[in-house]
């Protein structure tokens, strides 16, 4: 799936599923210098369990456009914009390595979103 945030393309592996607002959504965040590929087995498993799953490529990583973001805070703000663009209302965030820090910052800044 490719969508735009601030006029830059964002890539997300979505396992070919159609987003369903009625389902719980899980966003998977990779670590520094990685991409959605680190979640290639996990995303399929979670989708098979009935969740909407988005394994995102952060800016400057994988297939997403833009420069790498400079701080965990910037990444959390960017993630909030992604959530709004997609229209996610029922959300869990899983992170690997740096992705965990982004998930923690996001939940601290936007507790009503998770």
Task: State where each predicted segment sits.
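Surface-exposed charge patches
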Residues: 1, 44, 81
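N-terminal cap/lid segment of alpha/beta-hydrolase-fold proteins
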Residues: 1-9
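Membrane-interface segments of envelope glycosyltransferases acting on lipid-linked substrates or membrane lipids
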Residues: 3, 32, 51-52, 57, ...
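Active-site acidic short loop of glycosyltransferases
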Residues: 7, 21-22, 87-90, 112
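Conserved HGGG/HGGXW glycine-rich cap/lid loop of the alpha/beta-hydrolase fold
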Residues: 11-63
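Short, hydrophobic alpha-helix immediately C-terminal to the catalytic nucleophile
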Residues: 40, 80, 104-108
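Active-site loop/oxyanion-hole signature of alpha/beta-hydrolase fold enzymes
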Residues: 48, 58-94
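Conserved hydrolase catalytic core segment
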Residues: 89-114
């Amino acid at each position: 799936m490719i969508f735009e945030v601030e006029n830059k393309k964002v890539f997300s592996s979505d396992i070919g599923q159609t987003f369903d607002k009625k389902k719980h959504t899980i966003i998977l965040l990779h670590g520094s210098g990685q991409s959605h590929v680190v979640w290639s087995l996990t995303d399929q498993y979670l989708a098979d369990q009935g969740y909407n799953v988005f394994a995102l490529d952060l800016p400057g990583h994988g297939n997403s456009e833009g420069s790498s973001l400079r701080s965990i805070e910037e990444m959390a703000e960017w993630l909030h914009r992604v959530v709004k663009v997609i229209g996610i209302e029922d959300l869990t965030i899983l992170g690997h390595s740096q992705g965990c820090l982004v998930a923690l910052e996001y939940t601290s800044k936007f507790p009503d979103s998770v």
